[in-house]
């Protein structure tokens, strides 16, 4: 968990900097800064909430920045560079394990499965997981949710990631696709739309879904510092209201309309690719239907973290999960 040392260093550097948690824009809307871990169709409901005006209906103007990695996203949140982070719940556990007077609270779940796919360099007429034995596997960052879920799934199929694979984990998150495209690895774990783009370009072939294999977990969740939630409970509520409306929209709307709604966030991606990716995620129910983070999912998350050797102690559900905003959004 070397990334935590990076966070602590950055926070120390920024202790002299005071940033406003939120402010009013010229159009009278309250500004909320969101740091997302990556830009992905996996997060479609967030972008729907922006383009369909659901945040604006709640009196909010949401500014989204992409941090490109869980460590960078959490650094941004802790150092007050963002009010809300969209990132894996494991990051809140890591911060809690290090000791903090201002824990990171998960208040609204966005996705409920892993969002990565196994991409093979060579096409397979039929795929079985044991074909990965003795292969070169380009994985994700140690301690990150993609890598931990990947290892969990491999173990479920009788593969020891450390002993049965040549596992590469020293490549920065944002550079993993380029590394695979340049010839590194026989298999790679990728998010969409990169996996589908590689398949379309003949660089690789999607052979399995880690999300379909791993079960339901709080994979990406909106979270904020406890202090921000205490001081801005109404803002958090209105933000959650908009997210829930977007979640309902995604489940009730034809894929083509969803794709058109989020296309402004993916200007370099063809509409047919966006449609294909949304369908892929919808089929495996990756989009959470409500913002409520369930306790059983929280426990499975920690089982996965524990198997990866990154969990120091079980963190109780009520310690880092707050469901009152999601419940009110649903029941209002």
What would you call each of these model-derived segments?
Residues 91, 173-266:
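Pocket-lining segment of extracytoplasmic ligand-binding domains
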Residues 18-21:
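C-terminal motif of bacterial Sec signal peptides marking the signal peptidase cleavage site
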Residues 23-25:
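Bacterial signal peptide processing site
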Residues 230-312:
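Secondary-structure end/capping motifs
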Residues 1-8:
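Bacterial N-terminal signal peptides that target proteins for export
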Residues 67-71, 86, 140, 144-145, ...:
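Soluble non-cytosolic domains of exported or imported proteins
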Residues 301-332:
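Conserved C-terminal helix/tail region of periplasmic/extracytoplasmic solute-binding proteins
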Residues 28-162, 167-170, 179, 186-192, ...:
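Short, glycine-/small- and polar/acidic-enriched structural segments
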